């Protein structure tokens, strides 16, 4: 097993990684910015290293500082968590070149899956169903581009090859808008991602967001751990996640899961990963692969009993998967609500000091967070301050538990989205299951009905 690792992240995921390390007897090094000295995992880690001032670019995105911290503490590996440098192929490469283990896939795999055009090509080759599209980057010949759009059928969506998180994409509903949309998306992509390559896909009007969790050891073994539904979104950011996805039959799960597991072997994948799909009219359409642990990984852990962070650590230590596909069983249902420090009306971040805090509890209730009474939420980072996960023997029980847990949760001193989450849990359409990715924005009046 690994002797000592650097946790190159902050907040709830850093604490989650630290807990897994402690259970496995792995020593921990918490690297942190000057604003994060009082973070829970920093207070609990075996060693701490301040890697720079508050802004992310000078601390959590500072590659030389993170690698130096590993060197001076004698760590053997670096866990990137999610966000920050977790899907940065150059970081993964520099970590390995410096003689450390990157807890995640190889740099070339991150690069392959990070570029949407090469990722789609690799998935098609592996037999994973993809959205009908241009099968490569768009050129300057508008006659050819119009022909592609006609073949796919309007509406289409123009996407930046290096994009993500809802940025660098435009919906086009007819020939008249096509040329301008391509040039505008190119300009946007160049500015945001330093890559003006764009491609075209069929635009699905009312899809759900369903994703498959995978684990692969890089030694020819891979498994899928059922699916999650993350359709409750606002501005392409997930708000509520659940597992398994409502209405997905065991046959459908096996069909898509086996293809994802095979794709992992085909591309030489190592670690935890997630295949994201749009799901409409009983069909899956691959959109991207996240080559890291996801925010919503706990709902999968709750229904399968598999500790995904521990598996990441074991795989990084060179061990084969500790679980076989036939040992993965889906039991019950889990729902996760992301708790954000934000104004519930404007959705603007709400940093500040937490004056009073009480975590919910009870059977089947899990609270993943770094906050405590007296903790000051800094203004420099993502607004998510916790995740509330509730498990039940079925979906109705999980939702009922979540309603109670949200009512129990007390966070005073800052504004949060707890009331929004209570509204979602009480929403009839959510309770019925299977709402699409536009549902929440329409409910909130952020999108035309």
Curated annotation (Swiss-Prot):
Positions bound to Mg(2+) 1: 276, 288
Keywords assigned: ATP-binding, Biotin, Fatty acid biosynthesis, Fatty acid metabolism, Ligase, Lipid biosynthesis, Lipid metabolism, Magnesium, Manganese, Metal-binding, Nucleotide-binding
Keyword Disulfide bond: no
Binding site for biotin: 338
Active site location: 292
List of residues binding ATP: 116, 159, 165-166, 201-204, 209, 236, 276, 288
PROSITE patterns, per database record: ATP_GRASP (PS50975), BC (PS50979), CPSASE_1 (PS00866), CPSASE_2 (PS00867)
List of residues binding hydrogencarbonate: 238, 292, 295, 338
Pfam hit, one: Biotin_carb_N
NCBIfam families: accC, PRK08591.1
Subunit relationships: Acetyl-CoA carboxylase is a heterohexamer of biotin carboxyl carrier protein, biotin carboxylase and the two subunits of carboxyl transferase in a 2:2 complex.
Listed name of the protein: Biotin carboxylase
